[in-house]
Amino acid sequence: MKNIVRFLFVSFLFISCQQKIKPEDISKINGYWEIEKVVFDQGEDKEYGINESYDYFQIENNNKGFRKKVMPQLDGTFIVNDTYETATVRFKDDKTFIDYSTPYAKWSEELIAVSDKELVLKNAEKKEYHYKKAESINILGDGKKTK
């Protein structure tokens, strides 16, 4: 009986602490995001150190936009290509999803948390992708501001 009560209490805490995403939070997705770790369904984590690519999101006021991979350069710029995924934010049953599509595939990820510094997405395989807000890299020390 004690174990059941503990389980219910912990479950309640977990559910009540989960962030409720509001429409005004969606603009926080915009920008460059660097993956920090992936949490697998079985509970194991894969930590990421330095990443060769970032995810760049641009979501407009109509909840539509895109995601693309960019590669940061040492001078503060990014290498980009023409490949991208269209992205649409969808609210359903107190959950928030980002629906992606390319000419070849369609899929969704649940938006678990978003803030100015953190983004957490969960895919259909129940893998949680934890991102941190990324900035351009400028180690050349030329003093120039990067965009």
PLM regions and their residue ranges:
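Sec-dependent signal peptide recognition
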Residues: 2-10
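C-terminal motif of bacterial Sec signal peptides marking the signal peptidase cleavage site
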Residues: 13-16
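N-terminal helix-cap/turn-to-beta initiation motif at the start of protein domains
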Residues: 19-34
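Short, solvent-exposed coil/turn segments at beta-strand boundaries
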Residues: 29, 57-65, 91-95, 112-119, ...
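N-terminal glycine/threonine-rich, aromatic-flanked beta-hairpin/loop signature
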Residues: 46-89
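An anionic, turn-rich surface loop/hairpin at beta-sheet edges
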Residues: 79-112
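Short, compact, well-ordered microdomains
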Residues: 109-129
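Edge beta-strand at a domain terminus
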Residues: 122-147
